[in-house]
Amino acid sequence: MFSKPIFVAEVALSHDGSVGNACALIELAKKYNVDIVKFQDHWARYESSNQEKFRINIGLDKTRYDYWKRTEFTIEQWNYIYKFAKKLNIRLGFSIFSEQSFHRQIKLGNKIWKIGSGELLNEELIEIMLQNLGMEDTVIFSIGLSDFASGLRICKKFSNVVKK
């Protein structure tokens, strides 16, 4: 277990699809002694379609697919970001939203995961994570506006798989 508070910088998609912005945000987090920089790894073609509209439009993107496509990184770009973070001795963590994003982050060596309230009920993704994570992985749960009992039930499932 952790013996001191862990500070996480929630970058999510604030990089706006720019590797340079992502690296600048990692540098800023390092400057303020953040322990983990947490991104979202969306992969548009597995998580959306051109027909999926925004609840509230953001910027010039017409659909959620357009937004995620514009802000997603390739495995090569993520690899560059990982190497950049490693040079600064800062850890990365990820929220993932599809099996494909999960396996991409596994290939890159990710060991820190956040399951947000929107994914707590994604039983398929939860099962894939339970089958593939190990004692060296850390899972952060954000129950948010979800039913607390449901969130606790999911957390207990992971307690047999991961150490932290």
State where each predicted segment sits.
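N-terminal small/glycine-rich loop or linker at the start of catalytic domains
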Residues: 1-14, 50, 79-80
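Hydrophobic faces of well-ordered beta-strands that scaffold small-molecule active sites
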Residues: 7-11, 37-39, 92-94, 111-115, ...
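Conserved, mostly hydrophobic/aromatic
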Residues: 10, 29, 105
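Active-site beta-loop-alpha junctions enriched in small/polar residues
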Residues: 12-14, 40-44, 97-99, 118, ...
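Active-site-adjacent beta->alpha loops and helix N-cap segments on the catalytic face
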Residues: 18-19, 49-50, 74-78, 101-102, ...
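Catalytic domains of carbohydrate-active enzymes, especially glycoside hydrolases
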Residues: 24-42, 108-109
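Glycine-enriched alpha-helix->loop->beta-strand junction motifs that scaffold or abut catalytic
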Residues: 33, 105-113, 130-139, 158-164
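Glycine-rich, proline-tolerant flexible connector loops at the mouths of alpha/beta enzymes
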Residues: 35-72, 117
